[in-house]
From Swiss-Prot:
PANTHER family: 60S RIBOSOMAL PROTEIN L11-RELATED (PTHR11994)
Gene Ontology MF annotations: RNA binding; rRNA binding; structural constituent of ribosome; tRNA binding
Protein task: This is one of the proteins that bind and probably mediate the attachment of the 5S RNA into the large ribosomal subunit, where it forms part of the central protuberance. In the 70S ribosome it contacts protein S13 of the 30S subunit (bridge B1b), connecting the 2 subunits; this bridge is implicated in subunit movement. Contacts the P site tRNA; the 5S rRNA and some of its associated proteins might help stabilize positioning of ribosome-bound tRNAs.
Domain of life: Bacteria
Family named by the database record: Belongs to the universal ribosomal protein uL5 family.
Any single Pfam family the record assigns to this protein: Ribosomal_L5
Keywords: Ribonucleoprotein, Ribosomal protein, RNA-binding, rRNA-binding, tRNA-binding
Disulfide bonds: none
InterPro entries with a match to the protein in the record: Ribosomal_uL5, Ribosomal_uL5_bac-type, Ribosomal_uL5_C, Ribosomal_uL5_CS, Ribosomal_uL5_dom_sf, Ribosomal_uL5_N
Protein's UniProt keywords contain Transferase: no
Record protein name field: Large ribosomal subunit protein uL5
Entries under NCBIfam families matching the protein: PRK00010.1
Organism, as annotated: Vibrio cholerae serotype O1 (strain ATCC 39315 / El Tor Inaba N16961)
């Protein structure tokens, strides 16, 4: 079992129960899933780019990504409905906790000029979204085999009802918010 999950059960639940004075342990917010998304708009010209992006995502997440397709045609972007234009992965359970641990302790500190993540990127319901500009911050990605530096979107979905509860949950895991 992931260390972060054990830490959540042993310390975070008690800490948040006291902070927000919950009456039941089931009221304490928890992380439901982490969604990784990589948009590869250039894939309309070169299918190899999407394959490389999907393999990078599989290495980062430890799970095969789902190829996302365009929902509708947009002439300005030269895409048609159904064209493959990206990939996404939804992590739950053990893989989710492993990924979160690697994100907090290894990947984010490797970002150049890192001062913390934006604390205002909550959606109003306690879910947090952030973007990563380079996939090479993850140690699993071999820098020499990368054909193109791509970014990805990371969304952490929680059961928290408010942004304040969501921020307290992530802060309890020592999530590096900007001061």
């Amino acid at each position: 079992m992931a260390k972060l999950h054990d830490y959540y059960k042993s310390s975070v639940v008690a800490e948040l129960t006291k902070q927000f004075s919950y009456t039941s342990v089931m009221q304490v917010p928890r992380i439901e899933k982490i969604t990784l998304n990589m948009g590869v708009g250039e894939a309309i010209n070169d299918k190899k780019l999407l394959e490389n992006a999907a393999s990078d995502m599989a290495i980062i997440s430890g799970q095969k990504p789902l190829i996302t397709k365009a929902r509708k045609s947009v002439a300005g972007f030269k895409i048609r409905e159904g064209y493959p234009i990206g990939c996404k992965v939804t992590l739950r359970g053990e893989r989710m906790w492993d990924f979160l641990e690697r994100l907090i302790s290894i990947a984010l500190p490797r970002v150049r000029d890192f001062r913390g993540v934006n604390g205002k990127s909550f959606d109003g319901r306690g879910n947090y979204s952030m973007g990563v500009r380079e996939q090479i911050i993850f140690p699993e990605i071999d820098y020499d085999k990368v054909d193109r530096v791509r970014g990805l979107d990371i969304t952490i979905t929680t059961t928290a009802g408010t942004d304040e509860e969501g921020r307290a949950l992530l802060a309890a895991f020592n999530f590096p918010f900007r001061k």
